[in-house]
């Protein structure tokens, strides 16, 4: 089945609107709302988003959906122009990287991890998803597993929080983990689908302490 940009964008708008309502009402999502939230796929490949606020015309088939998107973004910003620009820029920045892992691949990875733990009589106490999206890998653990997730995109993080209320969610880049008040600083399993792209993320700690690791190899017996 070919990718339908309009259908994907409309699904994203519904998911964002639902997440906003859940956040404002301080409650958990209903079963129907969870279904809506799970359809969020980000704006990867929806290049029309990049045309918002520019002179580049948006195709007629996408104009109405883009208008609805802007209305939702305005509601999310609550009249704060600075926040509105941040949300919009965050959305635009995701166009080149926000591509979600197919469910069957996540299930295959999850089953392999679970089988490994079961075969070795191990318990998964902590789990980290460092580039979570809407948390595709979070079900890897069991009911007793403490989950932590990082997602730097503002709107995606909002959906993630609504979809996984029992997960400690940080709407920040994973490189900020040392400055966050995580409940755990060691994890039994770390799994995620890291965004592809030739982009460098500034990590001050890495720059100062780990840069030499990228400049050569050492062979230790």
Where are these regions (language model features)?
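SAM-dependent methyltransferase catalytic-core segment centered on the flexible catalytic loop
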Residues: 128-221
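Class I S-adenosyl-L-methionine
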Residues: 2-163, 167-168
């Amino acid at each position: 089945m070919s990718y339908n940009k309009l259908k994907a964008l409309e699904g994203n708008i519904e998911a964002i609107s639902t997440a906003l309502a859940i956040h404002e009402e301080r409650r958990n999502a209903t079963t129907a709302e969870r279904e809506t939230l799970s359809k969020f796929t980000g704006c990867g490949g929806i290049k029309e988003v990049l045309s918002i606020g520019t002179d580049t015309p948006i195709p007629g088939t996408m104009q109405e959906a883009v208008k609805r998107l802007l209305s939702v973004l305005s509601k999310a910003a609550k009249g704060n122009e600075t926040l509105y620009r941040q949300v919009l820029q965050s959305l635009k920045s995701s166009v080149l990287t926000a591509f979600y892992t197919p469910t069957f691949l996540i299930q295959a990875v999850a089953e392999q991890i679970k089988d490994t733990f079961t075969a070795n009589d191990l318990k998964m106490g902590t789990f980290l998803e460092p580039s979570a999206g809407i948390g595709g890998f979070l079900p890897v653990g069991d009911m007793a597993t403490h989950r932590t997730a990082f997602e730097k995109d503002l709107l995606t993080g909002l959906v993630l929080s609504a979809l996984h209320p029992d997960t400690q969610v940080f709407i920040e880049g994973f490189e900020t983990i040392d400055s966050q008040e995580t409940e755990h600083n060691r994890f039994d399993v770390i799994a995620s689908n890291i965004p592809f792209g030739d982009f460098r993320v500034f990590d001050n700690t890495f720059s100062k302490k780990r840069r030499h690791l990228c400049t050569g190899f050492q062979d230790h017996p």
